[in-house]
């Protein structure tokens, strides 16, 4: 029954509107209230269509972080708006909404624009990296990746964001 309600809600989003709603308005109509398992830990959102990759990255992070998962950019955008995680790890090539579009939308929304986004992808050419950074990505790691590199880079992104927040106060 819950899945049917969600599917009907998603269909409602796709109906034409007289005015263009913001992403936040669309998501507020569809989301139900949930709580994170451990609100004392920093929260990481993993967006990847490959369940094995999501599972592996989650296994690296679960001791230190609360981990939320999404299988495509659209679902990831919804979860980012709902939970406002401390960082996002996102694949580039995914169905529904790719990682570049997801990153661009995250950085355009006031509510999520401050969240560090790490692109974790098989796309490793400099031109592809440039495209990722132009979409607003804060970091770019190519698959296959070194797990220690991912963990250190993620920790640095979160720590740098915390320092900015301390320096500028609650303005960011």
Could you tell me what each predicted segment is?
Residues 55-62:
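Charged docking surfaces used in two-component/phosphorelay signaling
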Residues 94:
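Receiver (REC) domain active-site loop signature in two-component systems and cognate sites
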Residues 65-71, 79:
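Short hydrophobic/Thr-rich beta-strand motif most characteristic of the beta2 strand and flanking loop
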């Amino acid at each position: 029954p819950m899945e049917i309600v969600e599917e009907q809600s998603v269909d409602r989003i796709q109906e034409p509107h007289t005015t263009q709603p913001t992403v936040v308005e669309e998501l507020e109509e569809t989301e139900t209230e949930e709580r994170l398992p451990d609100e004392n830990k920093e929260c990481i959102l993993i967006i990847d269509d490959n369940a094995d990759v999501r599972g592996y990255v989650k296994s690296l992070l679960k001791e230190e972080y609360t981990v939320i998962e999404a299988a495509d950019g659209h679902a990831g955008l919804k979860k980012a708006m709902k939970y406002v995680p401390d960082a996002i790890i996102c694949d580039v090539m995914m169905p529904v909404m790719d990682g570049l579009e997801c990153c661009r939308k995250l950085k355009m929304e006031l509510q999520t624009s401050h969240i560090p986004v790490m692109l974790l992808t098989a796309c490793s050419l400099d031109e592809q990296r440039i495209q990722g950074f132009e979409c607003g990505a804060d970091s770019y790691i190519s698959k296959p990746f070194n797990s220690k590199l991912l963990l250190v880079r993620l920790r640095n992104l979160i720590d740098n964001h915390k320092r900015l927040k301390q320096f500028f106060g609650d303005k960011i």
